[in-house]
């Protein structure tokens, strides 16, 4: 990504996560954005997803099966569900990368703690060519 953007380390503040998805409006991604905006002076936000993303079509059910295969017990999963975690919402993927980027841009743009003067842009980077396409 830095090569596609023509930036070096330190030129930008990067927040990375699986799928480029904001899974909670007051989670760590938004917290990191708030720090970047209010403490580090960031004025522009770029949401960049990549083609062939591993989070595309991700299934909570399938991931839970992978967890169990790696030794996570059903009782642990049940206890976490009992504590209020909805695995289907928490571990969801997406089917349409462009739609997902638009939803993430919208979530940032309309967040009550993000100032209206912050510019938020969406992009998809081609995993094979590095080409960046604006959404």
Task: Please name every model-derived segment.
Residues 20-26, 37-40, 55-135:
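Divalent-metal-activated hydrolytic enzyme cores
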Residues 31-35:
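Well-ordered alpha-helical segments embedded in enzymatic catalytic cores
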Residues 15, 47, 130:
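Divalent metal-coordination and catalytic microenvironments
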Residues 1-30:
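Short, conserved "active-site rim" segments that organize catalytic pockets and cofactor/ligand binding
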Residues 43:
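Short acidic/polar active-site loop segments enriched in Thr and Asp
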Residues 50-52:
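Short, ordered loop/turn segments at secondary-structure junctions
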């Amino acid at each position: 990504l830095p090569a596609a953007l023509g930036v070096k380390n330190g030129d930008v503040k990067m927040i990375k996560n699986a799928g480029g998805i904001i899974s909670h409006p007051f989670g760590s991604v938004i917290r990191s954005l708030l720090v970047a905006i209010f403490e580090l002076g960031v004025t522009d936000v770029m949401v960049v997803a990549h083609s062939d993303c591993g989070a595309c079509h991700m299934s909570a059910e399938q991931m839970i099966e992978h967890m169990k295969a790696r030794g996570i017990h059903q009782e642990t999963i049940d206890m976490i569900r009992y504590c209020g975690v909805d695995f289907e919402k928490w571990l969801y993927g997406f089917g349409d990368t462009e739609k997902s980027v638009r939803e993430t841009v919208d979530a940032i743009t309309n967040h009550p703690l993000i100032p209206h003067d912050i510019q938020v842009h969406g992009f998809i980077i081609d995993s094979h060519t590095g080409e960046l396409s604006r959404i």
